[in-house]
Amino acid sequence: MDKETIKAHKISDEEYTQILEILGREPNLLELGVISAMWSEHCSYKSSKKYLNGFPTKAPWVIQGPGENAGVIDIGQGMSAVFKVESHNHPSFIEPFAGAATGVGGILRDVFTMGARVVAGLNSLKFGDIHNEKCGKHQKYLVKGVVNGISHYGNCMGVPTIGGECAFDECFNGNILVNAFALGICKSEDIFYAKAEGVGNPVIYVGSKTGRDGLGGAVMASDSFNEESKSLRPTVQIGDPFSEKLLMEACLELFKTDYIVGIQDMGAAGLTSSSFEMAGRSGSGMKLYLDKTPMRESGMTPYELMLSESQERMLICAKKGYEDKVIEIFKKWDLDAVVIGEVTNTEKMELFWHDELVGLIPIEPLSEKAPILNRPISEPKYLSEIKDYKFELKSSIQELFIQMLQNENINNKAFIYDQFDSSVQTNTIKADGKLGASVIRIKENGVSVAMAIECNSRLNYVNPKIGAALAVASAGRKVACTGAKPLAISDCLNYGNPQNPEVMWQFAQGCEGIKEACKELNTPVVSGNVSLYNETEGVSIYPSPTIVSVGVLEDANKTLKASFEKENLSVYLLGESLGEFGGSMVMKIQDKKVSGSLKELDYKAELALWDLLYKANQNSLLECANSVGIGGIAMTLAKMFAISSVGANLTSGFDDEKMIFDESASRAIVGLSKENEETFLTLTKEFGVKAYKLGVSTSQKHFKLDSIELNKAELDKLYFESFQEQIQ
C-alpha cells in the first residue's frame, strides 16, 4: 500500500503498523477504507475516550447508559424516556441546509432505533459575529440555512422542536456548532438494542437506497478546516425527511413484533460502523454480500457501499425464518428491504462481492479496541493573561441595560423558533420563547418531562473545568425551575484540534468538570457525543460542552411557567450574588473582552435550590420561576417581564449597581402571591436558601429595576424586534 493512499485515509504510521499486526498482511483499499473510518476520531473517540471513562453513568432510574444509540431513563409507570444530543458541525458549515437537516435526521434515528417514538427536539446553535465586515454576511447565510434545514426535517417528520439556544461569537467565525437533541418515549419493556447474535440469523438492510453522498464523512469530521475545505460539499449527506418518516413508522410497526434480535441505524461511516458495532457488541462475526445492497447509482464499488453515509437507512439482525415477515413490513411502507448478510461465529467481518471474498477483517480490534491516544496536554498560556482582569462599570446603567437586552446573545429569537413546529403531536406544555426549560406532557402516564440545553462558551474559555460544571448545573437548574426533578444528562463536547496540547488540556478539564458536577448533582451521563477538530486555519473555537438535562414532574398540571401573569405578585431572588463577572456578557458587551476568573461551584447550594423549587411547587406556593443566567438578574427579569402581561417595580438592594449583571450560579427568580409568602419563606430557611424580595408585579405597563426605567412597549420592542433587524 503506497504512503499517499495511507495518508489520504488519515492513518498514522503507528496505526498502519497496528493494522499490519491485526491482519497479518497488507490491507487492500476496501479494508483500509473500513479501518480508517472505524478508527477515525468521529467513530473511535481515540483522543477523548480516556477522559470519558470516569463519567458517572448509573442511578436507580438509569436503564441504559452510554454505549448504545441513545440513553434511557425510567419516567414512571412502566414508561421510559430515550434521548441523546449529537453534533453535525462540520457538514453544517460546509452546506448549512443539508448539514443541519441530516443532523436532525441522524439524531431522530438514534432515538427511534431504540424502539421509542420521538416526541421532542431541541438544538444548540453557535455562529460567528454577524456584525463582522468580512464574514458577517456569510454568518447570516449560515444562520438562515441551518435554521431552514432543522425546521424542514423536523417539521416534515412531525416531531416538535420545542426549545434551544443560539449564541454568537467571533470564535465561531470559522466553525459553527450545530448540536441537535431528540427525546422519545416507549414502554420500558419494549427497548431495542444494537446487537447481532445467533449464528445463521439474517442481516437485513432497510430504508433508502445507497448513493455516493456522505462518502468519507466520518473522516472529514475528524479533521480541521482550511482553504481546501470548500471542495468538501460532496461529503455532506443529503436527507429526505419523508423517507425517514416512513422508516420510523415501519420500525415502530416492526417493534410490535418479535421478529428481530437487534437494530442499528447507519450513521457516521454508514454500513461499516453499523455492521461492526452490532457484531462487536455481541462478540459475533458477520458475512455481508455487498452486491445485494440497494444502490441509487450505477457502478458503485464495495468501498463506496461500505463507506457511503446516505441517510435514512438501518441494519437489522432478524430471527432466522422471520426475514420475509420483516421485509413485508418495510415493503408495505414503500422502503427497500433486502437480506444482505448473516451472523457467524468467526468474530470476523467477511465482505463479498458477487461471491468473491474482497475483505476479511477481525471485528473486535476495530469496534472495541481502537487505538487510544495519549495526546500531550498543557495549560493554555492565555489563562494567566486574562485571570486577573476585573470588570468595572464605565457607562450609564440604563444604556448598558438597553445594549444588553438587544444584543443577539440575549434578545428573543422568534425569527428562529417561529420556523419550528412546536405543537405537533399536541404534547407541548412549554416551548421556545417561554424561557428556561421546555416541557412535554406524557399522555400515557400523566407526568411531564422537562428538558433544557445549555452551553456558555465564554465561561468555558475562562475556566474549562468550572465552565463545564456550570453547564451541567445551569441545565439542571432550568429543569428545576419548571418544578421537575433533574434526573440525567446527555452531553455534546465541542472542542478544537486535539493535536494542540492546549486544546486537549481544555478537553480534559471540561471532562473533569462534568464528572464532578454530575456526581455531586446526581444527574448521571446516559448518552453523548464528542466533536473535535472545530478549528479553521489554526484557530480553534472556545471550549463548548453542550449539556442537556432531562427531568420529570409527576403531575404535568403543576408545570411552572417563567412569566408573571398577575399583578401584585411578590418577586424574589433566591440564592447568593457573589460578584461573578469572569466571562460575563456585560464584560463582553462593554469591554469587548472575555477575561477574568470563575469561583468554584457550590454544589450544596445548587442542590438546595433545586430541592426548594421542587418542594415549593409541590405545595403550590409558586406562580412562576426562572433560572438566573447570562446578563444576571437584570436580563433574567427583563426577559421574564417582556413575555408577561404585567409591569414591574423592583429594587435589587445591591450597594454596587453593576451587581444586577453579576452571573453567579445557583440563583433563580420566583413569583408568588402574597398569601403564600410566609409559608414560602419558612421553606427557604428549611432548605438553607437565601431569599431576597425585589418588589412586585404591577398593573402599570412599566418596567423599573433600581434606576433603570422603561415603559413596557420599549422593553418589548428591544427584546422582541431587535434580532429580526440584525439578521436581515
UniProtKB/Swiss-Prot annotation:
Substrate binds at S87, H88, N89, H90, R109, Q237, E309, S310, Q311, S531. Gene3D superfamilies: PurM-like C-terminal domain, PurM-like, N-terminal domain. SUPFAM superfamilies: PurM C-terminal domain-like, PurM N-terminal domain-like. Mg(2+) 2 binds at D110, D265. It catalyses: N(2)-formyl-N(1)-(5-phospho-beta-D-ribosyl)glycinamide + L-glutamine + ATP + H2O = 2-formamido-N(1)-(5-O-phospho-beta-D-ribosyl)acetamidine + L-glutamate + ADP + phosphate + H(+). Monomer. Part of the FGAM synthase complex composed of 1 PurL, 1 PurQ and 2 PurS subunits. HAMAP family: PurL_2 (MF_00420). This is Phosphoribosylformylglycinamidine synthase subunit PurL. It comes from Campylobacter jejuni subsp. doylei (strain ATCC BAA-1458 / RM4099 / 269.97).
